[in-house]
Structure formats: structure tokens, C-alpha cells
Swiss-Prot record:
A GO CC term assigned to this protein in UniProt: plasma membrane
Bilayer-spanning residue ranges: 5-25, 32-52, 62-82, 86-106
Family, as annotated: Belongs to the UPF0060 family.
Bilayer topology: Multi-pass membrane protein
Source taxon at top rank: Bacteria
Source organism per UniProt: Cereibacter sphaeroides (strain ATCC 17029 / ATH 2.4.9)
Protein localization: Cell inner membrane
Name of protein: UPF0060 membrane protein Rsph17029_0436
Disulfide-bond pairs as recorded: none
Amino acid sequence: MGLSLAAYAGAALAEIAGCFAVWAWWRLGASALWLVPGALSLGAFAWLLALTPVEAAGRSYAVYGGVYVAASLLWLWAVEGVRPDRWDMGGAALVLAGAAVILWAPRG
């Protein structure tokens, strides 16, 4: 379980950072050099997501979706300086609950 959570959290950080590098270049006028660490970060994202001990890729991606939503809101607050509102937090709680059901449901 610890490896799963660490892999999902690391994947979220890597994907969000990689996508933000593209956002910074495309939307904020940052140097195209931002694309280099962005691409490396997106590669790390894929590698970390493949480390999860879930038996099916689609199920792993579904669980990751919940983690991604929550991590994106943390990024919004920590990096962009925009505090998530109660609707953001409620939505994150819902998707995390769904991700937990998918990840920890007893399967035969």
C-alpha cells in the first residue's frame, strides 16, 4: 500500500509539473527551455504510474485520476497561490473516495 500511494503521489507531481512547464511556455511566455524538464517530468510520470502494483492498467489509471484531482488542487494553492474553495475540496473528497474504493475493493 505504501508503494502504491508513493507512486501515485510521485506520478501526480511529475505530471502536473510537466504539464505546467508546457503551460508556462505556451500561456505565460516562459522560455522554450521549460519544455526540456517538462518532457523529462512527463516521462517520469509514466514510469512512476507503471510502478503501481495494480493488476490492470485501466484500474491503475482510474485510481490515479482521484489522486491527480487532489494533487492539482494542492498545486493550485502552493504554486499558483489560489486557495481552493469548498466546492473544490468537496469534489476532491468525492473522487478520492471513489479512488479508494477502486484501489482497495476486495477482488476474487
